[in-house]
Swiss-Prot record:
Sites of Phosphohistidine modification: 338
Known EC number: 2.7.13.3
Underlying gene: divJ
Region: Disordered, residue numbers: 561-597
Any one GO MF annotation of this record: ATP binding
Name of the featured protein: Histidine protein kinase DivJ
Cellular localization per UniProt: Cell membrane
Listed transmembrane segments: 40-57, 62-81, 91-109, 110-125, 137-158, 159-188
Histidine kinase domain ranges (all copies): 335-553
GO cellular component: plasma membrane
UniProt xrefs under PROSITE patterns: HIS_KIN (PS50109)
Domain of life, per lineage: Bacteria
């Protein structure tokens, strides 16, 4: 089946640069150039006529020889200048017109023996096979004939040759001009044949490619009449059904109205797409994309998407199941964490009573057991609180309790709680706080938890004799808390995972020290405040974690620095941590920065 003309003309443009065998240039089919042969024949005929004139009784004198020379000159120049640019060809046509009309004038005008040479520019133009050149040659021929006629009527033209010479010259003019017109016709037919052969080759190549398509390409006219079908038909659709019943007839009854509307939309807007169930396979799903290529003419592609649709449904269901599972897990963790805290509070309370010996003295072993119970219960309570907070955040049930307070108080409170842990670990804990207030509008408990988690992590992974520094300062409405340690550092591979729930860095021994929720909670609390957490670390050179929160209400209030106060026991009134010079802002040129997303 041959493609429609509009479709062929559109698709043929895609094959202009195809190599053989789809294209066969005209040069391959061309043999001897008829135009070149005609010019050579013209010169040969002029030479023969000149030789014949020598043997006639009356050679005609100089006008005849001048006429033969004027006729030979354009052919000779055309053989020398073979360029095909427009300017050269136009000048050659003018030369043919001048030579032909001059020869006609010298042999008696339009009634003379060589009047046929007035048509020389038409014959020359016909060999160029260009409508523009043919019109130009006809105009020049008309001008030359008018000049020859006016010269004859005015009596300026020489007398026309008579006798055998007139016959020779007339025969020469008729034969050469006629051969030129015949050569032009031959050239036109040959070039047209080459073009037709090339177009036929391109159409065959297009049809071959279209037949090999994995989808079905169709040409649609009007409201669904299928005029061409190429490619592989999807299951449930046949070529014969499309051609005989039309595009709408190939769809299931319930989809035909939508398909008719899509065809109208493609005619109106230029393109349309839809999916439908075919009439011969309602369990299948077929996608149709249509585009307008000409008035009342569409091209479309039919492809089976049953497998893709099932896969999409499976993915959607898996996503729904995963979301439901995650929500259920978060609710379960939130409920279980709450239920676990209730008996744990009792355990902590009774262990405190035993430690305080409120009901009498205890032996050293029982006192040690009570201390272990209290420490283990405190550790378990911290883990439960972390799980509870993370589950609330994941379940979108965590609400910030914002208030206005001095951020230094929350930082100092967190550091006091961790002072015993730092002393036990043999790690120096420093605080670098400004002398003026850091008034913020934030959740006090969340801010304290941020400092607790960051400092606790730093203490866990800093060897004995190391140092952990906590810095807090404000600028441009932003509160920045920086916790820097001289610990083991974090590898680039682990940095990519940190900040996600239950993800930990380091080896198995280091991972056993926590749950992987500390940094996740810090990041979550920072994001709830509209801020961010940034980790900078280099393996073996320590870690710096910065939390930036846009919660600062006013610039720091300047105050006179006071000498650093010595740290006190956890049960004493809240003293300010030791204020020292801040550590270097960077760990070096090889620092790895990571902002969890």
């Amino acid at each position: 089946m041959i493609l429609p003309t509009a479709l062929k003309s559109r698709l043929a443009l895609e094959f202009e640069t195809l190599p053989d065998p789809f294209r066969r240039p005209a040069a391959r089919a061309a043999g001897l150039d008829p135009a070149h042969a005609w010019r050579l024949g013209w010169l040969a005929a002029v030479c023969l006529a000149a030789a014949a004139a020598l043997f006639t009784a009356d050679s005609g004198g100089w006008p005849v020889w001048a006429a033969l020379g004027a006729g030979a000159l354009p052919a000779l120049v055309s053989l020398i200048f073979t360029r095909e640019d427009e300017r050269t060809q136009s000048w050659l046509l003018v030369l043919w017109a001048v030579g032909g009309s001059l020869a006609a004038v010298l042999t008696g005008g339009v009634g003379g023996a060589m009047a046929a040479w007035c048509l020389a520019p038409v014959a020359a133009a016909s060999t160029q096979d260009q409508p523009k050149r043919l019109a130009e040659g006809a105009a020049l021929a008309l001008i030359g004939a008018c000049v020859a006629a006016l010269t004859q009527l005015s009596g300026l033209a020489p007398a026309a040759p008579t006798g055998p010479l007139a016959f020779v010259l007339g025969f020469l003019a008729l034969v050469t001009t006629g051969l030129g017109l015949a050569a032009g016709l031959l050239i036109g037919r040959r070039r047209q044949g080459a073009r037709d052969d090339r177009y036929a080759s391109e159409i065959i190549g297009l049809e071959t490619l279209l037949d090999g398509l994995p989808h079905l390409a169709i040409a649609v006219r009007g409201q669904g009449q299928v005029t061409a079908v190429r490619g592989a038909a999807p299951p449930g659709v046949t070529r014969a059904d499309l051609v005989n019943r039309g595009l709408t007839g190939a769809a299931a009854p319930g989809d035909r109205q939508r398909l008719t509307a899509a065809i109208a939309q493609a005619h109106r807007e230029g393109s349309a797409s839809l999916t439908f169930n075919p009439a011969l396979g309602v369990e299948r799903v077929v996608a149709l994309d249509m585009h307008r290529v000409a008035p009342n003419q569409l091209v479309g592609v039919l492809r089976d998407i049953t497998v893709e649709r099932h896969r999409e449904h499976a993915l959607d269901q898996a996503r729904i199941d995963a979301e439901a599972l995650a929500a259920g897990r978060a609710r379960f963790l939130a409920n279980m964490s709450h239920e676990l805290r209730t008996p744990l509070n009792a355990i902590m309370g009774f262990s405190d009573i035993m430690r305080a010996r409120m009901f009498g003295p205890l032996s050293d072993r029982y006192a040690e057991y009570a201390e272990l119970i209290h420490e283990s219960g405190g550790h378990l309570l911290d883990l439960i609180n972390d799980v509870l907070d993370m589950s609330k955040i994941e379940a979108e049930r965590f609400e910030l309790q914002r208030g206005v307070f001095d951020a230094r108080e929350a930082v100092q409170a967190a550091m006091r709680l961790l002072r015993v842990q730092s002393d036990t670990a043999g790690v120096q804990l420093r605080g670098v706080l400004p002398p003026g207030e850091l008034e913020v509008d934030a959740d006090r408990r969340a801010l304290k938890q941020i400092v607790l988690n960051l400092v606790s992590n730093a203490l866990k992974f800093t060897p004995r004799g190391g140092q952990v520094t906590v810095t807090a300062h404000g600028y441009d409405g932003v509160l920045e808390i920086v916790v820097a340690d001289t610990g083991v550092g974090i590898s680039p591979e682990d940095l990519e995972r940190l900040g996600r729930p239950y993800e930990q860095a380091g080896g198995a021994e280091q991972r056993a020290r926590g749950t992987g929720l500390g940094l996740s909670l810090v990041r979550a609390f920072a994001q709830l405040h509209g801020g961010e957490m940034v980790i900078e670390s280099r393996l073996g050179a320590g870690t710096t974690v910065s939390v930036r929160l846009p919660v600062l209400l006013a610039p720091m209030v300047a105050a006179t620095p006071t000498p650093p106060a010595a740290p006190e026991a956890p049960s004493a009134p809240e003293p300010a941590p030791t204020v020292e010079e801040p550590p270097p802002a960077s760990l070096g040129d090889n620092v790895i920065a990571f902002a969890p997303r």
